[in-house]
Amino acid sequence: MNKKIVLFGGQFNPIHTAHLAVASEVYHAIKPDIFFFLPSYMAPLKHHNTQLYSEHRVKMIQLAIKEIGFGEICTTDLDRKGPSYTYETILHLKEIYHNAQLYFIIGTDQYNQLDKWYKINELKKLVTFIVVNRETDNQNVSKEMISIKIPRIDISSTMIRNRVRMNQSIKVLVPKRVENYIKEEGFYGDK
């Protein structure tokens, strides 16, 4: 039987409770053999003016994995550097996991702009997209995709960075270990 591998890509700057809720819902719905957190080097459709060095984002993901009890980190995009095109990442993983069934998690925000993704038609042949709702209660997705409804949690990495900058609490917004790491390293404060 082919392995099922779920990929959860993102900047994770920082990883937060809403990310972990998505990971948990998908993990328990799909029951993959491997669940990869896939930190991007540079997401092609996002701005990067507050990006931490990748080793710090990886460290925060490692701390979050300890809290949720599952997951591994795939550093393919970080190792490659430059824009993190999902198509190139999937081709690389197909070389390693030849017959694996690959799943890639996206939110409705990304689902609504898939037409802008690099080589999207080829990518759709290589991976099954899992669309999690972040903007709407009901979503209609293409029949070759999987839709998973998750509880709406209005937390963003931008909000967390702003709260740190304004000396506001981020308790429960991020895992405790991640909160401690952010404080110890002095991330996101005025510099």
Curated annotation (Swiss-Prot):
Disulfide bond annotation, renumbered to this chain: none
Top EC category: transferase
Transmembrane segments: none
EC number(s) on file: 2.7.7.18
GO BP annotations listed: NAD biosynthetic process
Transmembrane is among the record's keywords: no
Keyword entries, A-Z: ATP-binding, NAD, Nucleotide-binding, Nucleotidyltransferase, Pyridine nucleotide biosynthesis, Transferase
Pathway(s): Cofactor biosynthesis; NAD(+) biosynthesis; deamido-NAD(+) from nicotinate D-ribonucleotide: step 1/1
GO molecular function, one term: nicotinate-nucleotide adenylyltransferase activity
CDD domains: NMNAT (cd02165)
Catalysed reactions listed for this entry: nicotinate beta-D-ribonucleotide + ATP + H(+) = deamido-NAD(+) + diphosphate
One Pfam family linked to the record: CTP_transf_like
General function of this protein: Catalyzes the reversible adenylation of nicotinate mononucleotide (NaMN) to nicotinic acid adenine dinucleotide (NaAD).
Family recorded in the similarity comment: Belongs to the NadD family.
Name used for this protein in its record: Probable nicotinate-nucleotide adenylyltransferase
Organism per entry: Staphylococcus epidermidis (strain ATCC 35984 / DSM 28319 / BCRC 17069 / CCUG 31568 / BM 3577 / RP62A)
Lineage of the species this protein comes from: Bacteria, Bacillati, Bacillota, Bacilli, Bacillales
Gene designation per UniProt: nadD
